[in-house]
């Protein structure tokens, strides 16, 4: 039996990965997260609640597992990265140190690190290939730097100690599971925008000109990609862009969300707020490597995925107001 430790398994992407693993009887799943695991997860998985920054807790969580998928990190929207730069750098680095050491100590068969598209914050090649990570200038944001540091940690642990690693870089994750925050920019853009539209905001506020581009990737597609990379012999010591392929402007994404919330297309209007010091102008990855080596590609279209997310969030917000 393949026993997989999913760190950060109670998060939005983590929960999608756990659901994907539980759908395959060949996987036994252990989740480690300081957040409360939902009931379905507690009923289906072994749940560990220790602080993985502590080496003894990371070791306890990893013991008996053959595979690790490392998602535990401080994440969020662009405002969160600017609000907590030292905290997220410190926490994420401590997690790398303890969790990777535990993986080495317990001789896991595969350590899969879930990185971020933010390592390509200053990319100059489009569509951006995995190989471009070595030519891309160092990220300016603390978050981008911290996720790049995790990739360096994996490769260093392999070079010195033989860590069997795989790196996955999700791009612009969205889907049911993430609630918006009262402060704009703390959560990711999609739940933030859905909440604004459902609340009746008009004109709809976005950060920046709206010409910035993103590649929205549904969490279920990301989960499939991460598990495919972890499971495949071809994924060993490789890195993969885990992303949809359609490049959309933020303004186009806002319009898709507006119409998915049943607002009149003729009334669509944007208000442009000042953007942040670091805001990625363009994000468009090359996804051919994952398709070629793993047989994986994103399957959920943006209109379908956004409609699903709107329905989920509408139900949660209605329940909260009841």
Locations of regions flagged by a protein language model:
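NAD(P)H-binding glycine-rich loop region in Rossmannoid oxidoreductase-like domains
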Residues: 49-93, 105
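Conserved catalytic-site region of short-chain dehydrogenase/reductase
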Residues: 78, 113-127, 142-148, 160, ...
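Conserved Rossmann-fold NAD(P)-dependent oxidoreductase catalytic core, especially the SDR/UDP-sugar
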Residues: 97-140, 166
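Active-site Tyr-X1-5-Lys
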Residues: 140-171, 194-200
């Amino acid at each position: 039996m393949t026993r997989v430790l999913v760190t950060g398994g109670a998060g939005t992407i983590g929960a999608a990965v756990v659901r994907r693993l539980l759908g395959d009887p060949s996987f036994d799943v252990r989740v480690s997260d300081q957040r409360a695991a939902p009931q379905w997860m507690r009923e289906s998985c072994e749940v560990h609640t220790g602080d993985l920054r502590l080496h003894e807790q990371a070791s306890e969580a990893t013991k008996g597992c053959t595979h690790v998928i490392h998602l535990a990190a401080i994440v969020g929207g662009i405002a969160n990265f600017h609000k907590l730069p030292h905290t997220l750098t410190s926490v994420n680095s401590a997690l790398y140190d303890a969790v990777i050491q535990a993986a080495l100590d317990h001789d896991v068969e595969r350590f899969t690190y879930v990185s971020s598209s933010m390592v390509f914050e200053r990319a100059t090649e489009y569509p951006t290939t995995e190989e471009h990570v070595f030519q891309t200038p160092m990220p300016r944001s603390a978050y981008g730097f911290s996720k790049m540091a995790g990739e360096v940690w994996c490769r260093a642990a392999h070079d010195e100690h033989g860590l069997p690693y795989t790196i996955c870089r999700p791009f612009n994750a969205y889907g049911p599971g993430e609630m918006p925050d009262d402060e704009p920019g703390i959560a990711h853009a999609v739940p933030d925008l859905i909440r604004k539209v459902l609340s009746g905001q008009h004109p709809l506020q976005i950060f920046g000109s709206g010409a910035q581009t993103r590649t929205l990737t549904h969490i279920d597609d990301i989960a499939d990609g991460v598990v495919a990379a972890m499971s495949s012999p071809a994924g060993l010591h490789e890195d993969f862009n885990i992303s949809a392929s359609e490049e959309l402007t933020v303004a186009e994404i806002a319009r898709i969300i507006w119409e998915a919330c049943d607002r009149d297309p003729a009334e669509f209007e944007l208000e442009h707020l000042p953007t942040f010091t670091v805001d990625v102008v363009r994000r468009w990855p090359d996804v051919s490597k994952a398709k070629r080596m793993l047989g994986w590609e994103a399957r959920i279209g943006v209109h379908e995925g956004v409609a699903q997310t709107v329905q989920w969030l509408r139900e949660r917000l209605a329940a909260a107001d009841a």
